[in-house]
Amino acid sequence: MVSEAMLPRAAVREVEQRLTAAGCPDADFDARELFRLATGRDVRLSDRPLTAEQAAALEVLCTRRAAREPLQYLCGSRSFLDFELAVGPGVLCPRADTEVVAQAAAETLAGIAAPRVLDLCAGTGCLGLGVKRFCPAAQVTCVEKSPEAFVYLEKNARCALTGQGRQTENVLEPSALEQADVPAFDWGPSLNALRADRKPAYAVQPVQGDLFTYWETLPEGQLELIVSNPPYLTAAEMEQLQPEVAQEPAMALEAGEDGLVFYRALAQHYKNALCPGGALVLEIGWQQREAVTALLAENGWAEIRCIQDFGGNDRCVTARRPK
């Protein structure tokens, strides 16, 4: 047990041993990180004994991590591209491979001055914010159903891109482009209500909504990009989750018996919301390339291709509304 007056290295050894016994991967790294969270110090640069408050904080963190709570939840943040996202219980932690999806999505917008972008099943908002980071002029709306996840989405929409050398645009106010020669855009009742209420400035606009019905609110042909990392695990895969993943929200992971229910809805209902030539960019599971590309082809999508992640696995499918 971590106790008052313990020296830093002894405390970290104690935590590492307990995490190792609990089966935590990277127990040495986690122990050092938990020490930093509890004390605000780097164990390599500190020799002051722990105070009672620090020891108690480290003991709580160790107990939670030993129960296989994700380290990112304990830290309260997760790096994505070159910015930090708020995370915690109730929202899916962004994965490094999803950065590939954000980059692929942004690349579809090359040459478009002020693209309109919709991020569905947004979670933390990592994809929508990633697109905004690559394309500062993009007008991005992020849609998330879960009330728990929406708390993090709203916070990230306000805070994640500040200090990144980009202008954080208040998308609730008419932009210079909207005032000039770009036609007024109708995002549907949800976002229009937010605009009317004059909410705080956001880099991207958070909206609470359901992928399975949100398409009904969208006008035809006014988006340049729809991006999504929907749930895609099968029922069988949900039974075999790693302990840390099992503590993330099932709502963000499970997609029916075959893992394709969200892709069916996207393929069937969202094409007309895009302008001709507009892009759909989807994260997929590493074994889903054939199934997802077939769904898109069956529903009249064009220019379908697959992009691999850093590990060489199929990770992203892109398609376009025919011109």
Describe the residue ranges of each PLM region.
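Short, low-complexity, intrinsically disordered N-terminal peptides in bacterial proteins
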Residues: 1-23, 111, 159, 165, ...
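N-terminal auxiliary segments of SAM/dcSAM-dependent transferases
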Residues: 2-78
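Generic alpha-helical structural context detector
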Residues: 32-36, 63, 103, 129, ...
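Residue-level signal for pocket-adjacent positions within structured domains
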Residues: 45, 66-69, 75, 80, ...
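SAM-dependent Rossmann-like transferase core, predominantly class I methyltransferases
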Residues: 48, 60-155, 186-187, 318
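An acidic site on a long C-lobe helix of protein kinase domains
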Residues: 54, 94-97, 262
